[in-house]
Amino acid sequence: MTRFVKVGTGGGETTWHRAMLDLRPGDVLLLEPGFYALPQGKMLADVTIKGLGASPEDTRITSFFQVDDASSRIIFENLCLIPYKDSNTLDIPEGVDSFVIFRNCVLRGTGNKTTTLAISGKATVELIATKILNGTVSFFKTADFRLEMADSIIDYVSEEFGTLSLEGHGTAIINNSKITGTLNTFDYCNVELDIHNSFVGNLNMGGKTWLNMYKGQTGQDNSYSLYARGDCWLNIMDSVFPTSLCLADRARVLLHGSDAYSLQLKDDSQITFTNTLVRASANFEDRAKGDANRVTFYGNGDYQYFFYMIGKSRFKGRNLTFKPNGAPMLVGDEAKLAANALYSNEQPLEVECANKNNVSILGIKWTLIKK
């Protein structure tokens, strides 16, 4: 049976410590604005904790919580949660199968390797209009999860730790949200990742990651915007990558209507792209393959070549536009290029190659050059 328990210091209200001692499954705690502390932490099962202030910062709880293995649902609403010392704000351990919702909350992290939300069990986690400040979210190797993030922010940048780390098996759906640091998936994961109309500092993906990205934006403060390796499959539309988009191992990408600073492919990676701009350079190495239609390749002086192929890489293209701005193209080793172009702002286009029979460009004038 649901009990509504009003917590505060006024007449007729239950004190915070009494409410914690008498907490039962099904309880709904209604907290008056104020500061609440529980240094010993608390195991939670099927409870709702809601702040009654005008904003989350009006009702602050300093403590740490763990989800009980008998819990089916926990809700935090309109609260500011602060970890006690160096602890996780919420821990969902192995053996748990639960639903956890944060709605209009602020979670403050420790700013170190201690993650704010630690998920090792089976869980659905919803972040709705929620801010995680100076903290991280980690789904560990044993996790079987579903993450839904809407109108929320995870604000933490570190060269050592991922801002959002996805291991294990599960699905993450990120809508209208912002992740300021790195979103990581790992070599032993199996993850479906959907990013819609959201900002991510950069993406570092491995294992079996299936990415759908629509109207995504990455940051400018990293050496790469997106790095995919392993057996990743990426489907990207109408997105912007201010730094490099890198593929390795057996990664595959479908790229449409997007804008990338540069492309770097190696090993057995492949890209199929249409209606896309490549601002600085496109590099294909080893056995990498590219298939392009209505793509514009620029040179901006940051690289020696605006288009670079070596090893046994392969590229074919249709309706291409070249704007090298003084940079030549390189087709070296056993690499092969076959394309037709609509336009080049420099004619003849300069191509440096090891074997002229490995280059076929129709529609524009081009010439072979030597080093």
Model regions and ranges:
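Right-handed parallel beta-helix/beta-spiral solenoid domain characteristic of secreted/periplasmic
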Residues: 7-13, 46-91, 109-110
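Short, T/G/N/S-enriched strand-turn elements that build extracellular solenoid repeat scaffolds
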Residues: 16-23, 36-44, 60-69, 86-95, ...
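Beta-rich extracellular carbohydrate-active architectures
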Residues: 36, 54, 61, 76-82, ...
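Acidic Gly/Asp/Thr-rich repetitive segments characteristic of extracellular carbohydrate-active
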Residues: 1-32, 37
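All-beta strand scaffolds that present successive hydrophobic residues in beta-strands
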Residues: 48-51, 74-78, 97-104, 125-129, ...
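Extracellular/surface-exposed low-complexity segments
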Residues: 1, 13, 321-322, 339-371
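Long, polar low-complexity repeats
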Residues: 250, 268-269, 277-279, 285-287, ...
